[in-house]
Design a protein with these regions (language model features):
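Structural signature of beta-strand start/N-cap positions in the alpha/beta core
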Residues: 32, 117, 138, 166-167, ...
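N-terminal small-domain helix-loop-helix segment of the aminotransferase-like
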Residues: 2-99, 106
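A short helix-loop-beta submotif of the ANL/AMP-binding
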Residues: 134-140
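Short acidic capping loops at alpha-helix termini that bridge into adjacent secondary structure
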Residues: 88-94, 114-117, 164
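Conserved PLP-anchoring active-site segment centered on the Schiff-base-forming lysine
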Residues: 110-132
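Short beta->alpha connector loops at strand-helix junctions that form conserved
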Residues: 122, 141-145
Length: 221
């Protein structure tokens, strides 16, 4: 008897975590391994972050928080978006969650219904397509190879859109390629999206400060 749901059965294990597990097993056997799988820092948590976490416990931040996050945090996020990205948002437009992975998954589960299509530029982070599967959506993979610096074009985006298209996942700077979309490239993509108001752009910009190519621009700008 199958004990899991069809949604879970349709998903694939994370290749990243599988590689990390294999690395740990080899290290335990005494093998010298360089682990390039998971994106973990090569340093421990900075002291000021540890102290802030300890202080939060001492200050009794151990009860249920507001669903959208603490107001003070949402205010600071708005200030960051204004200062660093020149984007105007109010705290009421901000929802906090436990990291980028949960944020992206929450959005996908909130907007994607069975049969909805989500455009995913490739190469892509392995978890994107699994999140769409979990929402019972359909992944539409758009290949962007080395010849185009791993970035999809406006023409490719337009061609991939169908009446079932509900979302576009756009990661810049990109995981895993490091590719960064320029302002003009984002504007070209935005012009395509503007013609299809039912499509929601899921902009994963978690790596905006890990950028070795050029200036980070947000499609929200």
């Amino acid at each position: 008897m199958n004990q899991v749901s069809d949604r879970l059965a349709a998903m694939s294990p994370s290749a990243t975590l599988a590689m990390s597990q294999k690395s740990s097993e080899l290290k335990a056997q005494g093998v010298d391994v360089i682990n390039l799988s998971v994106g973990e820092p090569d340093f421990t948590t900075p002291t000021h972050i540890k102290e802030a976490a300890k202080k939060a416990i001492d200050d009794n931040f151990s009860f249920y928080s507001p669903v959208t996050g603490y107001a003070t945090l949402r205010n600071v996020i708005c200030q960051k978006l204004k200062k660093e990205n020149n984007l105007e948002f109010t705290p009421d437009q901000i929802v906090c969650s436990n990291g980028a992975k949960q944020s992206v998954c929450n959005v996908i589960l909130s907007i994607i219904s069975k049969g909805d299509e989500v455009i995913v530029p490739a190469p892509y982070w392995v978890s994107y397509i699994e999140m769409v599967k979990l929402a019972e959506g359909t992944n539409v993979i758009v290949e962007a190879g080395l010849d185009q610096n791993f970035k999809i074009t406006a023409e490719q985006l337009e061609k991939a859109i169908t009446p079932k298209t509900k979302g576009l996942i756009l990661c810049s700077p990109s995981n895993p390629t490091g590719a960064v979309y320029s302002k003009s490239e984002l504007e070209a993509l935005a012009k395509v999206i503007e013609k299809h108001p039912n499509i929601i752009v899921i902009a994963d910009e978690i790596y905006e400060h890990i950028n070795y190519v050029g200036k980070h621009e947000s499609i929200a700008q």
